[in-house]
Amino acid sequence: MSVLDALWEDRDVRFDLSSQQMKTRPGEVLIDCLDSIEDTKGNNGDRGRLLVTNLRILWHSLALSRVNVSVGYNCILNITTRTANSKLRGQTEALYILTKCNSTRFEFIFTNLVPGSPRLFTSVMAVHRAYETSKMYRDFKLRSALIQNKQLRLLPQEHVYDKINGVWNLSSDQGNLGTFFITNVRIVWHANMNDSFNVSIPYLQIRSIKIRDSKFGLALVIESSQQSGGYVLGFKIDPVEKLQESVKEINSLHKVYSASPIFGVDYEMEEKPQPLEALTVEQIQDDVEIDSDDHTDAFVAYFADGNKQQDREPVFSEELGLAIEKLKDGFTLQGLWEVMS
């Protein structure tokens, strides 16, 4: 299994997380912590804390820590500032985040309850930009600008452990002769005749590394994660001793990377925040049994009805005694009142 298969923090939007899911995963770093932040869209009037990591934004209520939300950077479509109506601050400038997760759009509005502080905007926007500009660490890439003057263009925090000349890429019937790089974050190969014919495979995207027989003889076979397209890539490294040595080295580096991934999001605050575990309140189990059969209530307030081109037809509500816009499938008036209360 690739590291990516277990990674959800930057690729998902989740609500009402457990205390375990609120903790940082290996490779995740807390960059900033902002107290007195209101989740104006979903929990207006509720003072909370916003945590900015290299993978996601976390918000939790200070009064009830199980009221929380996690927004992965890979889900973010747009970040802007807008005027919002806060119960705690009135009309004020707020951070507006539009996201898309599994074809569903959510919007979030966060308001800093400390007047005159731009830190909410600068922190989130800067870290999200750092995430967007460091995708080479995390994404499987074909035909990218990897090589300059026959040398690998190293990423920050990247170190080359081995460079192997005369490696055949077995993606075609004849094979292509090229150069193979093994680093601490990825595998790179490029053709000698045309260095724009290349591939970059981060350890994050590698599902398996094996030696298999092919029509060219024994070859290194790398299978990528399903999220990257499930590629199976073959490389011919001679002699066999060098092939075995390379596979051993790649497996070793992949194991080290899996234990402590390098996601490449490099951003530091002048003031170091406390560890995430010290900032999130442990959820206390009480005697009240919570019915969790219906999960729509937790996130209904965040829906961004982006596909709605016009108002839905009015229908008569016997419960309210007046005409209302027809509700979307799966939602009830009772459920909406529960969110508001």
From Swiss-Prot:
GO terms for cellular component: BBSome; centriolar satellite; ciliary basal body; ciliary membrane; cytoplasm. It comes from the Eukaryota. It comes from Macaca fascicularis. Pfam families: BBL5. Part of BBSome complex, that contains BBS1, BBS2, BBS4, BBS5, BBS7, BBS8/TTC8, BBS9 and BBIP10. Binds to phosphoinositides. Interacts with CCDC28B. Interacts with SMO; the interaction is indicative for the association of SMO with the BBsome complex to facilitate ciliary localization of SMO. Interacts with PKD1. Interacts with DLEC1. It is found in: Cell projection, Cilium membrane; Cytoplasm; Cytoplasm, Cytoskeleton, Cilium basal body; Cytoplasm, Cytoskeleton, Microtubule organizing center, Centrosome, Centriolar satellite. The keyword Mitochondrion does not apply. The lineage of its organism: Eukaryota, Metazoa, Chordata, Craniata, Vertebrata. The BBSome complex is thought to function as a coat complex required for sorting of specific membrane proteins to the primary cilia. The BBSome complex is required for ciliogenesis but is dispensable for centriolar satellite function. This ciliogenic function is mediated in part by the Rab8 GDP/GTP exchange factor, which localizes to the basal body and contacts the BBSome. Rab8(GTP) enters the primary cilium and promotes extension of the ciliary membrane. InterPro entries: BBL5 (IPR006606), BBS5/fem-3 (IPR030804), BBS5_PH (IPR014003), PH-like_dom_sf (IPR011993). Belongs to the BBS5 family. One of its GO terms (biological process) is intracellular transport. This is BBSome complex member BBS5. One of its GO terms (molecular function) is phosphatidylinositol-3-phosphate binding. Keywords: Cell membrane, Cell projection, Cilium, Cilium biogenesis/degradation, Cytoplasm, Cytoskeleton, Membrane, Protein transport, Transport.
